[in-house]
Design a protein with these regions (language model features):
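Short, Lys/Arg-enriched N-terminal segments with co-localized hydrophobic residues
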Residues: 1-15
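Karyopherin-beta/Importin-beta family HEAT-repeat alpha-solenoid scaffold
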Residues: 13-178
Length: 178
């Protein structure tokens, strides 16, 4: 299968430095996710959920989600939260990004789909939903031929056909919801 190299900005998406993986945002998100999924106290879970929902609305959520999505050494729920954050940010906060940053986001999400081509499927689905929502909001000049491009990128190898099918499944759902 054809390898797609990481975009040059992939590790520095939206100005994220190498130190981002140890930033207070990443640490805070990881702590809140730990509380949400593993703390037996219902009030702690509620507070963690509220903190995470508020965090997803911030501009910093773009780079933090990117850092966590790339980190293979963090728990699945952290990477899933990152993929869900991208979906939420694309749906509600895309205006926080200029046109060129939207193209970088597209390339970042495509590269992430390459990384997660063999699973976990729940992350693939969230990334496909984010890409479908992004495709609907980007101009054709910025991202023309969405479906043929996805077929070309993910349709040529058995290991990535599942990603293509997932995208082609969620795209019409996103169209009908928007």
């Amino acid at each position: 299968r054809e390898q797609h190299p990481a975009p040059p900005f992939f590790h520095s998406f939206l100005g994220m430095s190498e130190a981002a993986a140890t930033s207070p945002d990443v640490s805070s998100v990881l702590a809140a996710l730990q509380a949400l999924y593993h703390n037996p106290d219902a009030q702690a879970k509620q507070q963690a959920n509220q903190a995470l929902l508020q965090f997803q609305k911030t501009p910093q959520a773009w780079s933090t989600a990117n850092a966590l999505l790339l980190a293979q050494d963090v728990p699945l729920e952290s990477r899933l939260f990152s993929a869900q954050t991208f979906r939420s940010k694309v749906t509600f906060d895309l205006d926080q990004l200029e046109g060129a940053s939207q193209e970088q986001l597209r390339d970042t999400l495509l590269h992430a789909l390459d990384m997660y081509a063999t699973g976990p499927r729940v992350i693939q689905t969230q990334l496909c939903l984010a890409l479908a929502a992004l495709a609907l909001q980007m101009s054709e000049a910025r991202w023309g031929n969405v479906v043929p491009g996805m077929i070309e990128r993910f349709g040529g190898a058995p290991s990535t056909v599942g990603v293509l099918l997932e995208f082609l499944t969620v795209l019409p759902e996103e169209v009908s919801m928007n």
